[in-house]
């Protein structure tokens, strides 16, 4: 599948995967790309399959010359689902913001290398973390 005349989906998937462990290929459908980060484990004493994490997820969709994004901060529960939640611990919030900004910068640089821009989606008004100037 070709998303634009110059960028087939297979090549984009390889580039996205090279950004690190963030790409969730199983949740990428057609022209929709899903990335997430399990940044802070809530209880490391639990068995791995029962652990929950604070983290973030970001979804991308292509349009003419750019990708638009929406993202959320929240809890990745033991069932393997994301739930948007307000983070009350300032240290956890800082960690999530730091990892999200770092990923956003690398994603933006990668897209710029193929002459694509990265912009918030038109309907994404409530951005909990400012990602770019």
From Swiss-Prot:
The keyword Transcription regulation applies. Residues 99-122 are annotated as: Essential for activity. Keywords: Activator, Cytoplasm, Transcription, Transcription regulation. One of its GO terms (biological process) is positive regulation of DNA-templated transcription. GO terms for cellular component: cytoplasm. It is found in: Cytoplasm. The keyword Transcription applies. It comes from the Bacteria. Belongs to the Crl family. Binds to the sigma-S subunit of RNA polymerase, activating expression of sigma-S-regulated genes. Stimulates RNA polymerase holoenzyme formation and may bind to several other sigma factors, such as sigma-70 and sigma-32. This is Sigma factor-binding protein Crl. It comes from Yersinia pestis. The gene is crl.
């Amino acid at each position: 599948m070709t998303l634009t005349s110059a960028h087939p989906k297979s090549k984009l998937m390889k580039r996205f995967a090279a950004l690190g462990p963030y790409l969730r290929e199983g949740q990428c459908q057609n022209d929709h790309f899903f990335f997430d980060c399990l940044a802070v484990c809530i209880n490391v004493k639990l068995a791995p399959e029962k652990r929950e994490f604070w983290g973030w997820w970001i979804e991308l969709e292509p349009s003419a010359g750019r990708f638009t994004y929406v993202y959320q901060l929240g809890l990745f529960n033991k069932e393997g689902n994301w739930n948007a939640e307000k983070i009350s611990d300032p240290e956890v919030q800082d960690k999530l913001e730091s990892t999200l900004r770092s990923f956003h910068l690398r994603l933006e640089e990668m897209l710029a290398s193929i002459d694509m821009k990265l912009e918030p989606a038109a309907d994404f008004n409530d951005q909990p973390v400012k990602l770019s100037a």
